[in-house]
Amino acid sequence: MSMENIAKDLEARTIGLDDTFRFHCTACGKCCINREDILLNPRDLYRIAKHLNCTPLDVYQNYCESYIGSSSHFPIVRLKPKGHVKRCPFLKDRKCAVHEAKPGVCAIYPLGRYMKIDSDDYKQGNLDNPVVKYLIQPIECGDNSCEHTVREWLSGFNIALEDQAFIRWHQEIAKIGSILKQAEKKLSAPVMGKLWDTVLILLYLNYDVTKDYLPQFEENASDLMTALQTVQTMMKGV
């Protein structure tokens, strides 16, 4: 699908904060099987680790796997599906074992969200004024016995409408992904592997769950950008 068609599809499924949708979770567990696409951001890893009283590295090593996004050129972490039904590793007896700390994509289902940036700002590399948009996903489980607004649904899960952690994460993906894309053109595969490992460690795993998440993310992102700027300087001579 072309970027233009993707944009049209997003617009078609976008739903306003006070628009309504019908959905009722029946705890059937269907949304937790045949899943290879439960992607985690650093805050998801942090929250799950805190819930399980372990480290983000423990969660990553025991329940996740990673790959490099074909369009983002960025390390992507997903929950590693188990068994022939490809179930979420946290699905236990048809219930979520980390319900109180479930990944954001699971918590807001059947909604999804994306970050919209003005086209002129994007062309100029200005990511400072994004707007968080919400969309309705195809609903393949539960029933339609309850009606909600987007605002009500998110409030029920204590998710802010303007989720700063979500915004900052996607800003960094866009900014760092652009640098990594250029690096791929000039650096050898082994060097790129080390660079991607550095991104994975600093942005996804380098957190103390006894401390607040966002200040640590900002520090990690700053440290990573300093390292990438050094790489950019090196690439000028390649």
What are these regions (language model features)?
Residues 1-238:
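Short loop/turn segments that flank or connect secondary-structure elements
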